[in-house]
A protein has these predicted regions:
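Active-site-adjacent loop/helix segments that line or gate small-molecule/cofactor pockets in enzymes
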Residues: 1-32, 87
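Structural signal for hydrophobic packing residues in well-ordered secondary-structure cores
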Residues: 12, 16, 20, 71-75, ...
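PLP-dependent aspartate aminotransferase-fold enzymes
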Residues: 92-163
């Protein structure tokens, strides 16, 4: 049986929780630069790019080379458990770009939810205030704190009570 968008989306519906929404009714098979091909061979221009995390496009040669080189050294470790130099180097480079004559520190996280949660904690610690303003209809993530900030209930927290 050949793969189709419809058949794979049916499998997705059976295997993946409904909280992980999907905007487009296609299943990507491969991508390059700003182009994505679905499992049926149709070509699309990728305007989302991983929702703002893919600034270089799919399979940028420099990104692929850096990933390949890193895979020969270390695939993954939790920095909080075992530090590694590339993490420190990236933080140093980001810190150097931040304007101002004061000490800077950078935290690298995996998701936007983690970034939002840490930003809220930092803001609360810096101001001594507990309140946070969130806009109606805004999306901030899927963790408990970020769902509480997210003004878009459906599909993220519908039927779950107060966050």
């Amino acid at each position: 049986m050949s793969k189709t968008n419809e058949s794979l989306l049916q499998r997705r519906q059976a295997a993946v929780p409904r909280g992980v929404g999907q905007i487009h009714p296609i299943v990507a098979e491969r991508a390059e630069n700003a182009t994505v091909w679905d499992v049926e061979g149709r070509e699309y221009i990728d305007f989302a790019g991983g929702i703002a995390v893919l600034n270089t496009g799919h399979l940028h040669p420099k990104v692929v080379a850096a990933v390949q080189e890193q895979l020969t050294k270390l695939t993954h470790t939790c920095f909080q458990v075992l530090a590694y130099e590339p993490y420190v180097e990236v933080c140093e480079k980001i810190n150097a770009k931040v304007p101002g004559d004061f000490a800077k520190k950078t935290l690298l996280v995996t998701t936007g939810s983690e970034a939002v949660e840490n930003a809220v904690k930092i803001a609360r610690a810096a101001t001594g205030r507990a309140g946070v303003i969130a806009f109606t209809g805004a999306y901030h993530g899927r963790t408990m704190m970020t769902l509480g900030l997210t003004g878009k209930v459906v599909p993220y927290s519908a039927g779950m009570g107060l966050m």
